[in-house]
Amino acid sequence: MLDLALLGCGGGMPIPDRFLSSLLINYRGRKILIDCGEGTQVSMKILGWGFKSIDIICITHIHGDHTVGLPGLLATIGNSGRKEPLTIIGPEGIKQVISGFRTIVPYLPYDINIIENPKESLKIRLIKNSVEVLKGHNNSFMENKSSKDFARKKEVNTDGCGDHNDILSCDIEISTLELDHSCPCIGYKFYVNRKPKFNLEKAEKNNVPKFLWSKLQKGENITYEGIKYNPNMVMGRGRRGIKLSYITDTRPINSIIKFIESSDLFICEGTYGQDEDLHKAIKNKHMTFREAAKLAARGNVSQLILTHFSPSMMEPENFKQNAVEVFQNTLIGKDRFVKTLCFRE
């Protein structure tokens, strides 16, 4: 299962009881943060979700309401005792922003790996006290302090990590989509793999030696006494994972529909609640509640949570009906709202 917390649901500027954009994902004790607006650390502290285990920070774009919390957070992560490298993913310009922030926090006890404007999906493998990130045109795992001996070449699949070999060695896949905002901006999709079950009958039918079963279940390819063995020889059929999509600060472009298709949860900006504010949404390259709901309906998602509310909209719940009329299973996001996504049977 996947736990998530909306740390901040505001856009533009914080207001009482509403911090700026931030979402935290927790999977098997490792964390991914999406955006880091003002107040991110406060919400984390209130919830009691630790800082040290944040392995990846995904930034949608470099506007201040999505990034100004970064310097303080990076310092806090360092003060929490983290030594393992941390990965920051973002659009064009993120390297320059992080470089500027490092003048504020020049001394960190961990390395920062920056992936700017990724063109391929990124595969994440959970390891002890950290993660490994698969990136680059040769699809090799990034070399860092905790993964120098791990390098694999794999094909990238849009949803999930491909065949049994990939699924067994890849826990999460992160995909990005270029959006339509006033600066380079990307949306994120997270696919959590559900590993297939061991198939005893299949293993015996393929005459796989018992002492190789555990290695094959971990995704290894093995040659023993001149015979090649692979995970497909002992594993059952693939199982559906969990898909979470996150789209904010954009107009509702058509490419979003395919990107979010069949998501278990679609978190989307709803900067403006009233239909009458459509002209503002167009001018500022944002969305209304109704526009976000139309994307959810066309993308056939299971649930929509609206976030990134204009500071002028004090009570987003008052405009919920504008979204529900289009997509019934809509929730209005609130700071520190916590939800668990479970694997389907």
Predicted regions mapped to residue ranges:
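Metal-dependent phosphodiesterase/nuclease catalytic metal-binding core
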Residues: 121-306, 317-326, 342-345
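Active-site metal-binding motif and surrounding structural segment of the metallo-beta-lactamase
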Residues: 39-89, 111-118
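Divalent metal-dependent hydrolysis catalytic cores, especially in the metallo-beta-lactamase
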Residues: 86-89, 115, 265, 300-312
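Short acidic, glycine/proline-enriched helix-loop-strand junctions
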Residues: 86, 314-337
